[in-house]
Amino acid sequence: AVREFLKWCGEEYVFCTWGNQDVMELQRNMKYYGMLSLLPGPVTYYDVQKIYGICHEEAGGRRSLEFAIDQMGIPKAQDFHRALTDARYTGDIFKTLEPAAVCVNSSIDVYQNPKNKKEEIFISYPTYDQYVSREFADKEKVMKDREVASTRCPVCHMPAKRRIRWFMNNSRAYESVSFCQK
């Protein structure tokens, strides 16, 4: 089924999801069936829930799909939490979003991390920067790499001063809080 789906997608496609779990689950299933090579990663996609929050919520919060449908006045013709119905509703919300907000707010799923320095990803979003580094064998090697451990202001791109040291927010990502010295 996944081969047919990817064939249907064609060469130039982008995934749009409600939330940040679907692309990872797709890759997990593909790995289980020995097909992960059909979808090279890291995978760039549009998290419609995130973009909806940026456009319609003060703090860019994450709301349920049903909340967004209600807020946008889209008729509820079918039950939620069914794959095709949720996909249709997500598409309906996506159509209401400002194209400018969509274009600058892509997401990156890192189920498949970059394998070397050349594959690393740096993206500057309107309010923050994201750096997806290559894999490291252990934490000590990561923290000794000056480029990986550095932080920059997303506005002026100058080095930022760290206010809160690097910490792990889950089992796969480190974060820090820094501020611009300008």
Predicted regions and their residues:
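Acidic two-metal-ion nuclease catalytic site recognized across multiple nuclease folds
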Residues: 96-182
